[in-house]
């Protein structure tokens, strides 16, 4: 009687410095060993159980699928799903430590040259960057002083606050876009705005420039928003309408 033997193919990836044949063979043997299993104890229900009388019975019988229907489903799946060719999976692709030493050395050299080039470029432009450093945020100092020129909020804005149940200390933001800059660049507006904030002329304000969006956001308390909006339009020579935006509510006011 012929005995059947089942062979198992093992592909072992190892690092260049882990090339001991004995250790590699031992690792491969440990991998293909069967995991130890423990037989589960027989389940004994803690409730009265009778196989002939099930406590729960379905109202309807399970659906019966004929062989013809099953075959048609198989054909449909074979047509609709593209055939996937079986290919060996190599988990070491694109991993640098498993690459040949020649490729590794070339990568290290090219990476070093790139870093040196970038460092030289940064040193060359360091003087320019120190002269013109782009700021993204401008924050005013905390001050309890409130300008006397702040008038009560307009009826339209008060009605919006009552409808949305917003407090007068809720934060809002004015959105300044290029369309209201009146032939000025966004950077010019940003420079002028920073001066106003540093001089504490805009109460409770902080601002940020979103260069990728082409916008400047000026945050303030709602109680000061109309005063801030009028001051922005006057001191920055803005034209058109600017929108007051509140998080989760969108634009609630324009002027």
Swiss-Prot record:
Listed InterPro entries: Shieldin_RINN1
- Annotated region (Sufficient for interaction with MAD2L2), positions in chain: 33-88
Whether Cytoplasm counts among this entry's keywords is: no
Where is it located?
Answer: Chromosome
An example GO biological process term is:
somatic diversification of immunoglobulins involved in immune response
Q: Region Disordered: start and end of each range? A: 116-135
Task: Please give the function described in this protein's UniProt entry.
Answer: Component of the shieldin complex, which plays an important role in repair of DNA double-stranded breaks (DSBs). During G1 and S phase of the cell cycle, the complex functions downstream of TP53BP1 to promote non-homologous end joining (NHEJ) and suppress DNA end resection. Mediates various NHEJ-dependent processes including immunoglobulin class-switch recombination, and fusion of unprotected telomeres.
Which protein, by its recorded name, is this?
A: Shieldin complex subunit 3
